[in-house]
Amino acid sequence: MVNYPHKVSSQKRQTSLSQPKNFANRGMSFEKMINATNDYYLSQGLAVIHKKPTPIQIVQVDYPQRSRAKIVEAYFRQASTTDYSGVYNGYYIDFEVKETKQKRAIPMKNFHPHQIQHMEQVLAQQGICFVLLHFSSQQETYLLPAFDLIRFYHQDKGQKSMPLEYIREYGYEIKAGAFPQIPYLNVIKEHLLGGKTR
């Protein structure tokens, strides 16, 4: 017996009311948007840019079954540098991605001294280096050249927050799109390379 339509619909209503709503992962995270953008650039033959893996040292592995090994304990082997690197039109690209819920600034404690040093080294080798900053509460995204990030960082050794006004003055706003989602190569081509490509 199906009990159409009343008992089925009332049962559904009761279960949906009794379950708490989970708002986790409602929107795509900024990093996932960058990964989707990089996949698009790769599929179109525009750039080859990948997320850098974080090196870990495995300490203990549990083998409940021979085919089901489980890492129980692991540590970071070394401090990571930046999130992404690759090649665009013959230029080496290296960048960090940061997202904040704050409305007026991004905390500089999110940038570590070894990351700043790495960015300085990339710039010394004529690489293209920058940070993509996403203010999730305003849905604003900026590309800030590493030079401007480093300059601000060295003012007080990364102790204070970088105001949004500074980012708007020295960075470039990126409007989200469909394909690619975060078209940062447009900013690189137009502003960092002056419209030239190899």
From Swiss-Prot:
Keywords: Cytoplasm, DNA damage, DNA recombination, DNA repair, Endonuclease, Hydrolase, Magnesium, Metal-binding, Nuclease. The gene is recU. It catalyses: Endonucleolytic cleavage at a junction such as a reciprocal single-stranded crossover between two homologous DNA duplexes (Holliday junction). Its EC number is 3.1.21.10. The record marks K98 as: Transition state stabilizer. This is Holliday junction resolvase RecU. GO terms for cellular component: cytoplasm. InterPro entries: Resolv_RecU (IPR004612), Restrct_endonuc-II-like (IPR011335), tRNA_endonuc-like_dom_sf (IPR011856). Its cofactor is Mg(2+). It is found in: Cytoplasm. One of its GO terms (biological process) is DNA recombination. Belongs to the RecU family.
